[in-house]
Amino acid sequence: MQLDIKICGLKTEDAIAAALDGGASHVGFIFFPKSPRNVDIETAARLRHLASGRAQAVAVTVDADDEMLDRIVEGMRPDVLQLHGHERPVRVEALKKRYHLPVMKAVSVREASDLEVLPAYRGVADRFLLDAKPPAGAELPGGNGIPFDWSLLASLDGKVDYMLSGGLSAVNIGEALSIARPRGIDISSGVERAPGEKDPDLIRAFFSAVRAARGKRE
């Protein structure tokens, strides 16, 4: 089974080069001022150009209004919109119609009941990103470096297409793939030397760990 790999929160050419050389299927750019991974549209557009023909560019937003989304879509030309806020199904559907782009909806997970929202988004979201629910008081909806109980995902219908996110690293990716068996994975803080600072060596190490884990499974 093909495994999509998204490196998220990219801001520099050396980081995106490491992601693309490693075989990333998706590269993510975050438009959220509170995040240390926040990037301006001009930088994202330049980096996005480097990924053209090699990986899908994902614009990550958090409860963004239409004006901001218009600027991002026009300036960066993303392949996918990732909605990482509290966007309801009707909002997701409206944005799909407005921009004619695939939408990945992030859902925060701590316990089984958190997955009960998924049916409401099926048919409007093209894919889910299942991320660890942020700790109390956290300012960021994702990228907090904490995993959740992957065994919770065993109850999901096999037709649910999702990327697994939250606290992934070269150390635990083998276990995560074995337990959750996702069709895609997303990593951000697990390949950083400091918040918002991607480390090309850690990106390469992550891809090596993924290949090793998949080799064992096969």
UniProtKB/Swiss-Prot annotation:
Pathway membership: Amino-acid biosynthesis; L-tryptophan biosynthesis; L-tryptophan from chorismate: step 3/5
Keyword Amino-acid biosynthesis among UniProt keywords: yes
EC class name: isomerase
SUPFAM superfamilies: Ribulose-phoshate binding barrel
Keywords: Amino-acid biosynthesis, Aromatic amino acid biosynthesis, Isomerase, Tryptophan biosynthesis
InterPro entries: Aldolase_TIM, PRAI_dom, RibuloseP-bd_barrel, TrpF_fam
EC number: 5.3.1.24
Single GO biological process annotation from the record: L-tryptophan biosynthetic process
GO molecular function: phosphoribosylanthranilate isomerase activity
Domain of life of the source: Bacteria
NCBIfam families: PRK01222.1-1
The protein, known as: N-(5'-phosphoribosyl)anthranilate isomerase
Provenance organism: Chelativorans sp. (strain BNC1)
Name of the gene encoding the protein in the UniProt record: trpF
